[in-house]
């Protein structure tokens, strides 16, 4: 999905871009703090802050949970996805643009609806059932594809920085589940 499509979806549920790191205390819409948990590992953040709107935080937890459930069904492996970016301010976007060719001034990360998940690094909580990075990447891609088809997220595969760029969608616009 293009940056324009991500931006249009993010505007529906996102926040106004923050003027600085303190302005998140005066928002018209709530944001929630994101921390490492059983569903995912939060990498050390340099160019973003650990906050998302509630819908994006819920989508991130669902991705992590589905990833771990799929691993279990396919023979096990105690791995978690690695989240590498969350909410950004205009200042952090400007700094990031000097290093990352994928970064743009109109970064949808500024709206609190978007996060990045690495497809090149996963967190192994134990080494009992080793899996290849390609296998883990494939499972993550399947989870993201399914959630995209359900209307829950938009996904962009980034190459320069090995990650999936994911934007949460408005729950009111998600596709109804088909009955079986």
What residue spans do the PLM features occupy?
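Glycine- and small hydrophobic-enriched segments that form the cores of compact globular domains
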Residues: 44, 76-77, 96-100
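Extracytoplasmic/periplasmic, Sec-exported soluble proteins
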Residues: 48-59, 88, 106-109, 128-135
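Stable alpha-helical elements in mature extracytoplasmic
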Residues: 52-59, 63, 77, 92, ...
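Extracytoplasmic cell-surface/polysaccharide-interacting catalytic and binding patches
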Residues: 1-60, 64-71, 159, 167-180
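Catalytic cores and adjacent binding grooves of peptidoglycan-active enzymes
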Residues: 104-180
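Sec/Tat-exported extracytoplasmic proteins
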Residues: 64-74, 87, 144-151, 170
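Charged, often glycine-rich, active-site loop that binds/positions anionic groups
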Residues: 90-105
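Acidic helix-start/capping segments at beta-turn-to-alpha-helix junctions
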Residues: 76-93
């Amino acid at each position: 999905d293009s940056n324009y499509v991500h931006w249009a979806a993010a505007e529906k549920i996102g926040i106004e871009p923050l003027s600085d790191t303190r302005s998140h205390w005066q928002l018209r819409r709530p944001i929630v703090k994101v921390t490492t948990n059983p569903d995912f590992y939060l990498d050390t953040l340099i160019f973003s802050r650990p906050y998302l709107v509630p819908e994006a935080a819920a989508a991130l937890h669902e991705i992590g949970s589905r990833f771990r459930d799929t691993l279990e069904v396919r023979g096990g492996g105690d791995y978690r996805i690695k989240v590498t970016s969350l909410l950004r301010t205009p200042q952090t976007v400007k700094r990031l643009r000097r290093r990352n060719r994928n970064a743009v001034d109109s970064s949808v990360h500024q709206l609190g609806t978007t996060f990045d998940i690495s497809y090149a690094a996963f967190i192994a909580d134990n080494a009992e059932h080793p899996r290849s990075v390609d296998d883990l990447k494939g499972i993550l891609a399947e989870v993201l594809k399914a959630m995209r088809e359900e209307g829950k997220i938009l996904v962009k595969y980034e190459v320069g920085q090995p990650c999936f760029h994911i934007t949460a969608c408005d729950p009111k616009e998600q596709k109804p589940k088909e009955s079986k």
